[in-house]
Amino acid sequence: MQYRLAPEHPYPSGLEDSYSGLKWLKENGETVGVDTGRIGIGGPSAGGGMAAALALLVRDRGEFEIDYQLLIYPMIDDTRTTITANWDVPVWAPESNDFGWSSYLGELFESDDVPVHAAPARESNLEGLPPTFIMAGTLDAFADEDIAYAQRLNHAGVPTELHVYPGAPHGFDGFAASTAVARQARSDINAFLGRML
């Protein structure tokens, strides 16, 4: 799904675009051959964060439901206070994280008033979310926030799969697609999707 991108269009533009597109699909999907009873959302990195935020927004607005979320090393914690968020790790260093969040949040960056639909890790109530798949590598700046989010989902009663890949940095499944760890990640994703669909 296409949505307006930051920094030209900061929060909530992209999220509202995604919600509108998903709502259209739920209401009209059968006209284009989509089984509207089995729709999930997902994405990698900022797209994974957008998917997590979209799942919260869908739950909170209550107009329709989604069946699962697939969060691939999602960017979900704007506070950037975890240990891994401050490591100088390959691919996504602290400066990259600062740039990503400041671009997305605009004037809300480093504010105490960042909405949970902008930064899902801020949400205290994770009940009522759909079954969730989360993956991250141990060398990913988002590893700590993703692991913590998965644990919180699990404690909230959300069926949650967490996959952590040793030695894998952010985006490993793309730039190192032929490695054993990337093949394992694809296998884990496919198995989850097989169970959801």
Model-derived features: positions:
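Alpha/beta-hydrolase superfamily serine-hydrolase fold, recognizing
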Residues: M1-L197
